[in-house]
Regions:
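Short beta-strand edge/turn micro-motifs at domain boundaries
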Residues: 110, 130-155
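A solvent-exposed, acidic/Ser-Thr-rich amphipathic alpha-helical stretch
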Residues: 29-31, 49-104, 114, 128-129
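Bacterial N-terminal signal peptides
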Residues: 8-19
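Bacterial N-terminal signal peptides that target proteins for export
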Residues: 1-9
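A short, structured loop/turn motif at beta-sheet edges
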Residues: 102-109, 122-125, 137-143
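Generic short beta-strand segments
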Residues: 113-120
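Generic C-terminal helix-cap and adjacent flexible tail
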Residues: 26-27, 154-156
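Short, low-complexity N-terminal intrinsically disordered segments enriched in polar/charged residues
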Residues: 20-55
Length: 156
């Protein structure tokens, strides 16, 4: 194969390689969006933390800072205890992620957006959900799982 034939072959291989990378990136973004959807379906379940157990990586390095957190919660075991206590005063919640922006790099992804909804407390009061949120996901054994969740009030 002469130099004249090598360049077109190289260009063709590069095009197929780039197309494969794009397809993988699209698949990963879709996977992160599915993990996000599962997270927000789990967060509205008022239980002992079982729903969240299905969407979080159960590792010692997961982190959580929620709207009622007084400290950074590190590790799955600490977080599981948190969810059990966190859910006690609620009778129900609705929460949706709006205006989400997703970025994937390798086996990590992050998503930033706004959480919007309403929480009904057991005492009959309601609380508006209107937070800025950052979620971090890790692809573990082919599955995107939450490894960090941080929410804060919107600046006034």
């Amino acid at each position: 194969m002469g130099p004249r034939n090598t360049f077109p072959l190289f260009a063709l291989l590069l095009a197929f390689s780039a197309d494969g990378a794009f397809a993988q990136q699209t698949a990963d973004i879709d996977g992160v969006k599915a993990a996000s959807k599962a997270f927000y379906e789990a967060v509205v379940v008022v239980d002992d933390g079982t729903a969240m157990e299905k969407v979080w990586a159960q590792t010692p390095y997961v982190t959580y800072v929620g709207p009622r957190s007084t400290a950074i919660i590190v590790g799955w075991e600490a977080q599981k205890k948190y969810w059990t206590e966190f859910n006690k005063p609620f009778s129900q919640r609705t929460v949706a992620l709006v205006d989400a922006h997703v970025r994937v790099v390798g086996n990590l992804a992050w998503e930033i957006g706004t959480e919007s909804g309403l929480a009904q407390m057991k005492d009959g009061s309601t609380r508006k959900v209107d937070w800025i949120v950052t979620n971090v996901y890790e692809k573990i054994d082919g599955r995107w799982l939450t490894v960090s969740h941080h929410v804060q009030p919107k600046p006034q």
